[in-house]
């Protein structure tokens, strides 16, 4: 495989749409391969802006503005890293011959929960929780009665768990409706899901390089308010259950098509596996691979995009812990304790230009002989990180 130098006529250009902490790692890996890198986001000084060859501040939901930038830069690959992007722009760019990763169709289906849930359950035929789509409070009441309490209520379009809640009784319906309505983005619809009292949940990082599908070891994770706070690898599970999980992930990723990494989220209840969601990009819970694998999810993503051979090997057990800000600040900082500099620890400080309550500002990484002990240490150490 040939890697022309950046700024030469035949350079391989990647345009990243969304330049947060995950995108920053993708750009760093692209730089290691000598690719020409362009980072785009809606705000200045986004994390990936500082490591890309060029950066732009653009409203990515503005179809014409985004198309103009794509035409100007003429990227080899367009990598959407967030959901707040004009789908029309991506579809039109693909029609004009640009390569959207993994494809405009896959981005379209996974951009909202209605698209991917309908696709997975009704077209691919994988097992999911019961679900209904609603628009009004009355429709929500009817759907909740039909599915039963408790149930999970989410906007069809939102990210990082925004607007998601568990409704445990009819008296809570209106408050849950208002919470979801506030966060529902470009869609007027909500999804009501059966609450699965799962034993645990995993992310199965699934890679497609156009020739074969490859899996990373399963990643366990804990979420709070729909957003990840801890992850660990490997998640302990029976081989028979892992095979079921891999089959679901393979079926969904094969049906979506395209190259790259897919973060497939699954619920496990006893020996049953339920499909939850899929992201066609590196996954936040996968940051643990920065310390557990020979190649991180970010390096593997790029290799898959390029159609290169993939060699996935876990070299250690480990855990990650997200550090979130508790305050609004125009001059944010992260203070790490001396224990974070131990030989089996690592960290990433994202360098975001401003902080606000709940914004992820850093991640702590720990490796150990067992994932359980790494997680225990991560939970203890993250409490010593401050602003």
Swiss-Prot record:
Span of domain ATP-grasp: 118-306
| Entry-linked InterPro entries | ATP-grasp, ATP-grasp_carboxylate-amine, ATP_grasp_subdomain_1, PreATP-grasp_dom_sf, PurT, PurT/PurK_preATP-grasp, PurT_C, Rudment_hybrid_motif
Where do the annotations place N(1)-(5-phospho-beta-D-ribosyl)glycinamide binding? 21-22, 81, 284, 352, 359-360
Family the entry assigns: Belongs to the PurK/PurT family.
Query: Magnesium: present as a keyword of the record?
Result: yes
Q: Which GO terms describe its cellular component?
A: cytosol
Q: Does the keyword Ligase apply?
A: yes
Catalytic activity annotation: N(1)-(5-phospho-beta-D-ribosyl)glycinamide + formate + ATP = N(2)-formyl-N(1)-(5-phospho-beta-D-ribosyl)glycinamide + ADP + phosphate + H(+)
Q: In which pathway does it act?
A: Purine metabolism; IMP biosynthesis via de novo pathway; N(2)-formyl-N(1)-(5-phospho-D-ribosyl)glycinamide from N(1)-(5-phospho-D-ribosyl)glycinamide (formate route): step 1/1
Q: Which residues are listed for ATP binding in this entry?
A: 113, 154, 159-164, 193-196, 201
Name assigned to this protein: Formate-dependent phosphoribosylglycinamide formyltransferase
Write down the species. Wolinella succinogenes (strain ATCC 29543 / DSM 1740 / CCUG 13145 / JCM 31913 / LMG 7466 / NCTC 11488 / FDC 602W) (Vibrio succinogenes)
